[in-house]
Amino acid sequence: MDESILEGLSSVKGYLGGAINNYTGECLVCDAAKLSGNLEATSATFNDIFRDSHAVSKNLKLGATEIMEIHTEKAVILMGCSGEESRVHLHAFAVFNSDGNVALGKMALKKLLPQAVEALA
């Protein structure tokens, strides 16, 4: 899998970077051209947070977490899951600046995950 799979996300207004990780946190593809810092390492930490949210929501009998949104002073981080029962369990991450089009980002993230699963299945 290469960075071209992130094109749908990268075309959204305000996109700063994105990554796709397997369930264990290994970064499979990463685009951090507009971000400072190490997105590959950071996405592994976000992966842990997302896995914890899976456990918490399942503990409450709500099912696995599908999408998560974190707002910071300068950005919005979206995290999405391909589904625990999908052929390949993936987590995708996207970072947008605070005035980016987060609604379109969510749609692009939901569209990207099945494509990534198909590419790896």
Model regions and ranges:
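Non-catalytic interaction/Regulatory regions outside core domains
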Residues: 1-17, 22-23, 27-121
